[in-house]
């Protein structure tokens, strides 16, 4: 009997469906199909969607361009969750239309935090004083 792989990451199918859902959501938001005052005044990006293993739940990570306050945008998306789910169902051929959940995309914040850490004076000092192991040794050395 074949055993399931023990990897904990998303399967290839989850990744493929997540990308299809991401494209569908991005298209609906870009076209302005949802009539909402908040969504009408914000350009919303969908950098990532994660699917549950059974493909019945899609978590969309969203971020308004320009770093504007994302709370009203997420609230507006939640209000229109049903319409967005129907729009995704029309664009993505699945047995079940996934339930949509919206979360704030924190990758930019995490990247900024790492950048601040790397620019920290103590880290710079450590990086500058690190031994350079990459230089080739000269000599016959055995």
Curated annotation (Swiss-Prot):
GO terms for cellular component: cytosol. It comes from the Bacteria. Residues 123-142 are annotated as: Disordered. It is found in: Cytoplasm. GO terms for molecular function: ribosomal small subunit binding. Its main location: cytoplasm. InterPro entries: KH_dom-like_a/b, RbfA, RbfA_dom_sf, Ribosome-bd_factorA_CS. Residues 129-142 have a biased composition (Acidic residues). SUPFAM superfamilies: Ribosome-binding factor A, RbfA. Keywords: Cytoplasm, Ribosome biogenesis. GO terms for biological process: maturation of SSU-rRNA. Monomer. Binds 30S ribosomal subunits, but not 50S ribosomal subunits or 70S ribosomes. Belongs to the RbfA family. One of several proteins that assist in the late maturation steps of the functional core of the 30S ribosomal subunit. Associates with free 30S ribosomal subunits (but not with 30S subunits that are part of 70S ribosomes or polysomes). Required for efficient processing of 16S rRNA. May interact with the 5'-terminal helix region of 16S rRNA. This is Ribosome-binding factor A. The gene is rbfA.
């Amino acid at each position: 009997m074949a055993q399931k792989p023990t990897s904990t990451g998303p399967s290839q199918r989850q990744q493929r469906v997540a990308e299809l859902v991401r494209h569908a959501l991005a298209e609906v938001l870009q076209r302005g199909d949802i009539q909402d005052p908040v969504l009408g005044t914000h350009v919303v990006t969908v950098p990532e969607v994660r699917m549950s293993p059974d493909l019945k739940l899609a978590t969309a990570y969203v971020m308004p361009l320009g770093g504007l306050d994302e709370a009203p945008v997420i609230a507006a998306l939640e209000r229109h969750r049903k319409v967005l789910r129907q729009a995704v169902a029309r664009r993505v051929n699945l047995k079940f239309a996934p339930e949509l959940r919206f979360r704030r995309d924190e990758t930019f914040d995490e990247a900024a935090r790492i950048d601040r850490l790397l620019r920290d004076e103590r880290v710079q000092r450590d990086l500058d004083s690190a031994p350079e192991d990459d230089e080739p040794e000269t000599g016959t050395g055995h």
